[in-house]
Structure formats: structure tokens, C-alpha cells
Amino acid sequence: MKIFDGHTDIMADVVTRRKAGEKNVVKTHHLHKLEKGGVEGANFVLWMDPEASAWEDVELGMAFIHDELRDSPDVFHHIKDIEDLVCDKNNAKIDIILGMEGLAAMGSSIERLKWLYEQGVRCASLTWNEANDLATGISGDAKRGLTSDGIQVVKTMEKWGILLDVSHLNETTFWEVAGMATKPFMASHSNAYTLCEHPRNLKDEQLLAVKDSGGLVGVNAVADFLHPEKPDIMHFVQQVDYMVELLGIDHVALGFDFCDFLHLDQQKEPEDRHVTTSLETSMDIQNVIKILEKKGYRHEDMAKLTKDNFIRVYRHHLK
């Protein structure tokens, strides 16, 4: 079963390694994992620490990303419009939709948002947990939501065709976004709070609001969002089952958010890391597929879950 991963931070690794002089980072370090997992497309997002990154860092990061794309035309098919979405990949291995995980560095500048759009960014979250000039994430003041500038950015994103990701928003901001959205939005890498009470997870009412927008929720494999003690692949499967029961198959997808390659020089020893057993990297994705198929998920439902739901939502946004 071929997979569209709703959230990967591989581009953060691309930027880090290219700063150090490497080239062909995805081919060297990631492609074998993606191929083993059956990943043929993903939202490849650029994340930068909102407390330590300036706009110039975003510009440099995007330059490195486009260098990577140009150096590997046999790997990447960059989707920027509806024609790209539906056309053949011309033998490239991976469909890539560029995204931003947080917009803190752009301040409130619509001109900078336009620049990101021109760079090919087609999905974005307003914040990565923090409070910024646009909105408030889960670590910010619970009573603070969208700013007036944030409202304009949401409207502009919808107008231009940038899919809004609500995964890191606090509840106040979430509900303000839900109340003003006129197109489907997504929680690309979020789980159900009912099954795991973590502030990054969404309560049932929020999940239903995503559904009501016509959007989707991508189930997340990060250990902390699955179980507080001993998360494993079955906790991930339970999240899928729960959301399918609550939302229907048309509004559930996969947004794994694998972190095995991040901060490699600072990682703890494997036995000390809090990981999701049997679902640690892209290479493990087919383990999930096999379990879901054994549970009786039909082929057409699996197709929606693994790729088609994302395609449907992007059809509402791409020009």
C-alpha cells in the first residue's frame, strides 16, 4: 500500500546537513527508509526554532531545500498546483508538498507569506506551540487566540491556496480558526485527547470541527502523543480506529511525524529514548498497514486513509 505521509521533518535534516556541506541528503540518508515504508508522497515541512530563528534563516533554509530538489529530479516531484497534483510523477519517486511548521519568523508580513507561496509552500501552521504575531500555540496564554494580523493571514492563505494546519494551536485559536474558515483545514499530525491526555492532542469536539470543515486529521506516531508510559504500534492503531469511528474514514489520514533523524548528535542511547515500539521510522509504516488490513479495513478505505483523503483536501486549495 502506497503512503502519503501528512507530516515529515526531513527538510530540517536537509537544511542542517547542507549547512555542513553535504548534498543529496535525502538520497543518502532518507530515501531507503521512505521506499521500504512505501511512502510515495508527503507534506515536507520546514521547522525552525521560533525562539532562535530570524527571517533570514527561513530564506536560507528554503534556498537549501530548493538546491536539494534541483539536485535530485529523479527523487522529487514538487506539487505546486492542481495539475501537478493529478499528473504523472515522470518517474520521480516522491511527491513533495512543501510546508511551514510555524510562521513566527515572518512576523505579520503578507509580503513574506507571498514569498513563501512563490517558493512553493502549499501548507502551513500559524505557530509551533508558541505565541507569535499571528496566533497562539499550546504553550501560550490559554485565553489568547488569533491576532488581527493572524485573521488576515488565514484569509490570505485560503485565497491563495495554502492549506492551514491546526495541529499546534491552543484551543482558543483553534476555535477562532474553525469559526472563520471557509475551506477544509487539517490537523496533519494530531491524535485524540480522549485516548491520550496530552495538550498536543485534540478533544472530540475539535476533531469533529475538522470533519465539519471537510478536512482531515493525520494520526501521529510520536510516543508522547500515544501513551504516557509504554507506547507501541497498537496505540497508534487504536487512534486510527477511534478516529475512523468518530469521524468516518473520509476524514482520517496518516501524519507520522517521525523524529528518528533529528538532533542525531544529541540523541540519548536507544534504550533510553521514548519511542513507539514497532513504529519508530518510515521503514515501519507497512507494519501499520498489515495490522489494519487484518482488522478488516477494506481496500478502498485503506486507499482513503493512506493517500486519497489528502488528495481530496488539496483539491479544494490548489489552483
Segments the model singles out, each with a brief description of its role:
Residues 247-271, 278:
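Short acidic/histidine-rich active-site segments
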Residues 277-319:
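Mid-to-C-terminal alpha-helical segments outside catalytic/metal-binding sites
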Residues 43, 252-255, 301-306:
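Conserved active-site loop/cleft motifs that coordinate metal ions or position small ligands
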